[in-house]
């Protein structure tokens, strides 16, 4: 469970949103560790003893730059966005890649199992829907709170298989800016790093119709030690493409 401190300035929209997640309301910050803070119209992640915070904001910062100046060309090639219109992001996290995929015109279903992270992402999507510059992109993202490995097979039964399953398992950040390093420190302390990568990749390959795309560091190891069918490599990032079971091209 994650503590959430609800300030008296928190709007009704924020108060209603946080009720959807398994969060523990508290009257003061914990003595150590991380917690969520709901104040005004935003939910943020805080670390005790630190002044900075983490929020999901698709209208400014890196998200705004990628939206207005371009970006995402490599990921667009990896998912073959013109031919494959539906993507399930099984490791949504703070939603950056989900937003990039949605900005390419794809219908994105995002899964996040950690309640605090899902709350942060849901809050970011909510505010993006209210902004004329981001609302069209945000409207293409549907967030599911829960374990993707469990939820995807069930969702296939009602919606059918997506064209693409996208995975971005956490890995150590290297050669990043101080701001990104601090954000990832907050994130790793909150959710930890344990992931059953083999099981996740297995479920993804069972779920996708066309391909599974895995984001990795350019020189990083293959996910679960399994070699992909092919790769798209950039300066710092690599996208490994795996084919669904029983297919020979994607």
Swiss-Prot record:
Pfam families: SAM_MT. It is an enzyme of class 2 (transferase). The keyword Methyltransferase applies. S-adenosyl-L-methionine binds at residues 96-97, 168. Keywords: Cytoplasm, Methyltransferase, rRNA processing, S-adenosyl-L-methionine, Transferase. GO terms for cellular component: cytoplasm. It is found in: Cytoplasm. One of its GO terms (molecular function) is rRNA (guanine-N2-)-methyltransferase activity. It comes from the Bacteria. Its EC number is 2.1.1.242. It catalyses: guanosine(1516) in 16S rRNA + S-adenosyl-L-methionine = N(2)-methylguanosine(1516) in 16S rRNA + S-adenosyl-L-homocysteine + H(+). Belongs to the methyltransferase superfamily. RsmJ family. Specifically methylates the guanosine in position 1516 of 16S rRNA. This is Ribosomal RNA small subunit methyltransferase J. The gene is rsmJ.
